[in-house]
């Protein structure tokens, strides 16, 4: 069963995770959101019920 042979796939998986962890992830971490979350209380809107013409 060739899919159980870890020879090429284990190396590819480890190299891809190593690439992600060491190269791509540090470049993505310095990005911060432009608008940080605030502590505003949510406002509730008053809605009026809809009257259906056939009821």
UniProtKB/Swiss-Prot annotation:
Belongs to the ATPase protein 8 family. It is a single-pass membrane protein. One of its GO terms (molecular function) is proton transmembrane transporter activity. The lineage of its organism: Eukaryota, Metazoa, Chordata, Craniata, Vertebrata. GO terms for biological process: proton motive force-driven ATP synthesis. Its main location: mitochondrion. It is found in: Mitochondrion membrane. Residues 35-55 are annotated as: Disordered. Residues 37-55 have a biased composition (Low complexity). The chain crosses the membrane at residues 7-24. Mitochondrial membrane ATP synthase (F(1)F(0) ATP synthase or Complex V) produces ATP from ADP in the presence of a proton gradient across the membrane which is generated by electron transport complexes of the respiratory chain. F-type ATPases consist of two structural domains, F(1) - containing the extramembraneous catalytic core and F(0) - containing the membrane proton channel, linked together by a central stalk and a peripheral stalk. During catalysis, ATP synthesis in the catalytic domain of F(1) is coupled via a rotary mechanism of the central stalk subunits to proton translocation. F-type ATPases have 2 components, CF(1) - the catalytic core - and CF(0) - the membrane proton channel. Pfam families: ATP-synt_8 (PF00895). Keywords: ATP synthesis, CF(0), Hydrogen ion transport, Ion transport, Membrane, Mitochondrion, Transmembrane, Transmembrane helix, Transport. GO terms for cellular component: mitochondrial membrane; proton-transporting ATP synthase complex. It comes from Corythaeola cristata (Great blue turaco). PANTHER family: ATP SYNTHASE PROTEIN 8 (PTHR39937:SF1). This is ATP synthase protein 8. It comes from the Eukaryota.
